Amino acid sequence: MSEFKIGVMHSNYNLPFDEVVEKASRLGLQGIQLARTRDEFSPTNMPASHRREMLDLLHSNGLVFSAICGEQLYGFTDRERNAQLIENSKRLLDMAKELETNIVTTHIGVIPNDSSCDTYKVMQEACFALAEYADSLGAHFAIETGPEVSSTLRAFLDSLGSKGVAVNLDPANLVMVVGDDPVEAVYNLKDYIVHTHAKDGKNLIKGDVNHLYATAQAEQYHGEYLIEMPLGCGDVNFPKYLAALKDIGYSGFLVIEREVEDFRAEDIAYGAGYLRGLLED
């Protein structure tokens, strides 16, 4: 039996939550990552009674929340805007704990290579605050990989002196955006990985990561600069990647994420089978 658990990003089905739970259960998955936390499932729209109902539904289907998404429209690169974003993130961490997970994943913006620049310092300040709060809850605010190579992210995390800000490792983002090796990333980030996405893809043309990760621009670059693909069809070497995760002692979730419009349900089912096949070898 594999030590990994397989889950799915709930928004990828584009269905009501209860139908997503039913589909995940039928696939024999073990968890769901909750998304749409800026609107339908935001802390302000999720009273305690609703949270309990969602948990009851999950548990009755043998599922748990692997994590929730911290869907910020912006990264933490603007000091004036950060105060509100940090408060929003704290409320998401509170909600995560009530939903019986201790992980909120998000993008924080593109970490500059120059650690002495103002943007780097602004992002550090925000992440110091998030790490302190996460530590107080026994939780993690997990940065999703992709906008920078893993060595840059590792140096940034080391500067915080806390595991309160950790890593959600998305191997496809590393491949598609910055051309980084996911296996190397596993070893670089081994002390911080608390959650992972199972996603695959290819880089087509090197692009400006600041544009690629700008909310208003992201969709238009798919197919021009990068392409997301079903698991096993892109440039992520999943056998080696999973072996590396096992080697560092990771035993958490592999959450299938399929963000394209066509064939999502089919690709999620295929992905679950693909992962199981690798994990049984």
What are these regions (language model features)?
Residues 233-247:
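A short, acidic, amphipathic alpha-helical segment used as a generic capping/interface helix at domain edges
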Residues 46-52, 82-90, 116-127, 179-186, ...:
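Charged helix-capping and loop-helix junction motifs
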Residues 9-13, 35-37, 70-73, 109-111, ...:
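Active-site beta-loop-alpha junctions enriched in small/polar residues
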Residues 6, 68, 125-235, 272, ...:
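Acidic/histidine-rich catalytic cores of soluble enzymes
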Residues 16-19, 57-60, 77-167, 176:
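Active-site acidic/histidine proton-transfer and metal-coordination neighborhood
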